[in-house]
Structure formats: C-alpha cells, structure tokens
C-alpha cells in the first residue's frame, strides 16, 4: 500500500492478444491462422472464449453453497491450501476473486472491461510485489485476531493421512521501488514508501496452552 499513490503510464511490454489471467487455457493456436485478418479474428475468438470460461466459473462459485454435512467448508481460504506437495500455480479461486473484484470495481460491460484492463493500457502498479507459497514450517508462528502469538501447525490430519498447510503470501518486492518510494510519486514534493500489508486467513494452529484449533491469523497479502 502507498499513500498518495498514482499509476504512471509506460510503454506496454505485453502483446495486444496476451491474457492477463493464467491458470485457465483456451483451445486453438495462432500457427494455424493464414493471415493478419485471420490472426486478429483468432485473438478475438480466444479472448471471447476466455471471458466465457471466467463468467461460467464465477457463476458456479456463487451457486455453490457449503452443505450442512461439511462443517469444515467455511474454514477454506483462497490463500490457504492443504496439499501433499508444493502447489505449482497460484490458487484458482484467488485468481477468480482478484478478477471478480476488478470487474465489480469497473462496473462496465465485459467487452469494455477487457479493453480497459491496466495490462492492456500499459499501466504499472504503484508498488511492485512478489507472491509465493510458504509452508507452515517456514512461518512457524503467527499473530491471531486477539493479538496472541500462535504456532502454525505444519500438517493437518485428514481421513487418509496428513496434508501440509501452504500459504500464498504477497509482499513488496525487494527490488525496484520498494526502497526508493512509490512509482508515480513526485519525490521533490512527497515522501512515499511501499509497505507490505496483511490480512486474516484461517489456519490450523496451536496456542500457548497447547489447544489446537482453526484460527484467523495474519499473513502478508499485498503491497
């Protein structure tokens, strides 16, 4: 986060047909197209297909409701994952949530929103950030909603064994503008600094009285 921050426009390094949201793949490739006009139609078709898939997934996410039998359904967080190995990609629901927030804020038609994507206009973020999966073994401890320090358990028992807890954390990049100030701020008149901010997610933890349970803890979620 950054006070008095404003984006600075620069030349885009993305192609006009690039998709800004990984994790979903559309069918078709541009090598089978015969000419410039066909290539343009192909890019439009791929973008439309991508939008259609996104809309379907968002609709399905709204329809799905946790059943009464699944009492742990509400413990799930988009930035927490239980897995036997390190996840290879960002969580899909996290990507959908980020995209949905952008759509809600834009309040435009899908086609207009696509062309107003900051990645297409060549805009850069005020602060650079990096995201990665972090294990409970790396976190070890965290602060819960009451301000107490709790131990983050590395493994979660499941019917067929144990799974590890992984947290998808986002923090300010150590390179670039993190130390020099926020991008787009006139240094002659303003002092600025990019800082990592935190949010609460639910995780399996143990307090100082050895009581194990699901609690909200703070993790790094933005810059």
UniProtKB/Swiss-Prot annotation:
Residues 6-114 form a propeptide. Disulfide bonds join 127-194, 172-223. Pfam families: NGF. Keywords: Cleavage on pair of basic residues, Disulfide bond, Glycoprotein, Growth factor, Secreted, Signal. SMART domains: NGF (SM00140). Gene3D superfamilies: Cystine-knot cytokines. Glycans are attached at residue 107. InterPro entries: Brain-der_neurotrophic_factor, Cystine-knot_cytokine, Nerve_growth_factor-like, Nerve_growth_factor-rel, Nerve_growth_factor_CS. It is found in: Secreted. One of its GO terms (molecular function) is growth factor activity. GO terms for biological process: cell surface receptor protein tyrosine kinase signaling pathway; modulation of chemical synaptic transmission; negative regulation of neuron apoptotic process; nerve development; nerve growth factor signaling pathway; neuron projection morphogenesis. Residues 1-5 form the signal peptide. GO terms for cellular component: axon; dendrite; extracellular space; synaptic vesicle. It comes from the Eukaryota. PANTHER family: BRAIN-DERIVED NEUROTROPHIC FACTOR, NERVE GROWTH FACTOR NGF -RELATED. Belongs to the NGF-beta family. Promotes the survival of neuronal populations that are all located either in the central nervous system or directly connected to it. This is Neurotrophic factor BDNF precursor form. It comes from Candoia carinata.
